[in-house]
Amino acid sequence: MSRKKGNAADLAPSRKEKKGIGQYILGFFLLLYTLFCFLPVLLVFIAAFSDEKAILENGFSFWPEKWSLVGINSVLKYGDQLVASYAVTIFVTVFGTFLGLLVMAMFAYSISRRDFRLSRFLSIYLLIPMLFNGGQLSGYIIFTSYYHMKDSLWLLILPLCVTTMNVIILRTYIANSIPNELMEAAKIDGAGEYRTFFQITLPLLKPSMAAVGFMMATAYWNDWQNALLYITSDSKKPLQLLLVSIQKSIEFLLNNTNVPAAARAAMGGNIPQYSSTMATVLVVIGPIMVVYPFFQKYFIKGLTVGSVKG
């Protein structure tokens, strides 16, 4: 017995130390790919702090001839409105993601139960929006004329709250990764459906919910079309719609030949078309880039674990 243990101990270090040349080659190409993906983000950051005249004369560069804060200031000058839009976007993103995850998790749980009579009907009902779409006009008429929800934050939350693909991801995870015997045991112990869902299924569903939640949060964060259709108050204007307004105001200045000389001098002699565009991109992607690394492992695990039946 001791000899067998000794042989196993001798083999263990050799397995750890052995690394084929293929792993080094793979690591090298992955490093190159990482740099390839990071360089555009770096260029956006540099261009946001570049002088507009230098961009017009020499194009975008990783080391511009002249640095300038005109582009970023053209966005930050909206101070109070920018803070209010950030607050609206964060609220819509957090609350919409939480509400959507709760509703979709309950929906996915119900259609994953084999003993639920309406499981097949609801599964077919779930697929209808993927095949048929009423379009924006019908949705606009229903929300504004019948529900009277014009200029309401609910119209930034409800349209993206439930999506077919996210429900399918959650349902697949429940069916493939959570043993049905666990739910049957809870039922035998006297647990109802709500208790089984909240105390057993929901805690085990966290990896998949993290993946779906990140995709939902990204969709809410980048949504500007619903705000453009339904929001009219400045106090309810989300970040994306504000940035669209900033870009339109810059385009107006570019197309207006009667811009005062003092205004042009304040902008460095040139209207910051490209630098301000990069500054708006930086304002948008900054928070997502900060948050994503913390959810990356859950995002990958949630998409892969439920895809293979164990």
How does the language model describe each region?
Residues 2-310:
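A hydrophobic, multi-pass inner-membrane permease signature
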